[in-house]
């Protein structure tokens, strides 16, 4: 049995969130009655209103009036008035992943998982399948620049979704094809141990049907180890590793992008097929790797080499993934979602490839628990930055932790040998500090999952106002 079309209003608590809004948008486009609320207004709410969803700002018990089912994310606390009202009225309450799973049952699916790179890789898979005429439905964890949205309803048989592992619910997703980009220590507030994280990814792949397949990056040692533990499922490996089935070869930075070749090796015959002269208009080895994963899936699903090459060359990217927000006196300002040490190091390495000038990193640590559990890694991931400006921790609802704050982080970076580390007293002072550090040809890279994106977009104008 599938989600009946005649079901009454589906209510989303936190409908403006990047994960929730995509599901809501696809449901609206499918003809379901959708309503919801969020704590504050934003771009996603406005987009959903225009599509016909009934959206409220603020959480109130009466918002769930008439709802047949209530959808919540893990960000919603048990004392939320709408969640409490739903339970008092015996309205079914489901997690975001459960509703996503219902949508996935309508199509054949590709699900992209991994600690980092999910959103970009999801966008790349969608772009390639679209170029191949497969017209996929897409539900992503970021705004796809080509769509102006994180979701779209396609007429084809395939759905491409980002599989969020943060609360373990990605194990509920019924996918036919899986990508695993990497597995690092993250979300330990939920999983408790890194071993539990690895077990979850192993189960994610083992949940595939016998006719499906997984595309896994063996450049990452943990993923390579997982490949060796998974039995009875078809695995296609990818990466720069010479043992990979789909190999990234001859990677050359080209200004703001990369040129490379992808080689496919047939395990049975040993024959090699190559797609040469691929041009990706995004810098960074990590983005070329993500593209290789997407290419592996696309070719497996019948997309031609010519369509792949054209789509990669025209790739429009994702909002908040190395996004240029403006310039000032030859200084370029970049906004990036990177908030884990591995992501930060990759972004700064991509920045280093993109300029001969200095790299000024502005970091807003996201969550006290993440900074605490990965403190050593955070203190060593800024090596490609010539200067680091450190803002206060963005709490994301967490309580402060003694000894885990901006000043201790600044001290940690200095203790690990970083020569230029500047604490940011307050956001309005950012432009003045940047003006003193950056000159023409330099890159200012704003990093974090909090409200630093607003600073990144305001910064060029603030710098111009200073002269």
Swiss-Prot record:
Pathway where this protein functions: Cell wall biogenesis; peptidoglycan biosynthesis
The family this protein is said to belong to: Belongs to the MurCDEF family.
Function of the molecule: Cell wall formation.
Subcellular location: Cytoplasm
Residues spanning the signal sequence: none
The keyword ATP-binding is annotated on this UniProt entry: yes
Gene3D superfamilies to which the protein is assigned, alphabetical: Mur ligase, C-terminal domain, Mur-like, catalytic domain, NAD(P)-binding Rossmann-like Domain
Entry's Gene Ontology molecular function annotations: ATP binding; UDP-N-acetylmuramate-L-alanine ligase activity
Chain's gene name: murC
Species per Swiss-Prot/TrEMBL record: Bradyrhizobium diazoefficiens (strain JCM 10833 / BCRC 13528 / IAM 13628 / NBRC 14792 / USDA 110)
Annotated EC: 6.3.2.8
GO biological process entries: cell division; cell wall organization; peptidoglycan biosynthetic process; regulation of cell shape
Top-rank EC class of the record's enzyme: ligase
Recorded catalytic activity of this chain's protein: UDP-N-acetyl-alpha-D-muramate + L-alanine + ATP = UDP-N-acetyl-alpha-D-muramoyl-L-alanine + ADP + phosphate + H(+)
Protein's UniProt name: UDP-N-acetylmuramate--L-alanine ligase
Gene Ontology CC terms, in alphabetical order: cytoplasm
UniProt: ATP binding residues: 114-120
Classification of source organism: Bacteria, Pseudomonadati, Pseudomonadota, Alphaproteobacteria, Hyphomicrobiales
Keyword annotations from UniProtKB, A to Z: ATP-binding, Cell cycle, Cell division, Cell shape, Cell wall biogenesis/degradation, Cytoplasm, Ligase, Nucleotide-binding, Peptidoglycan synthesis
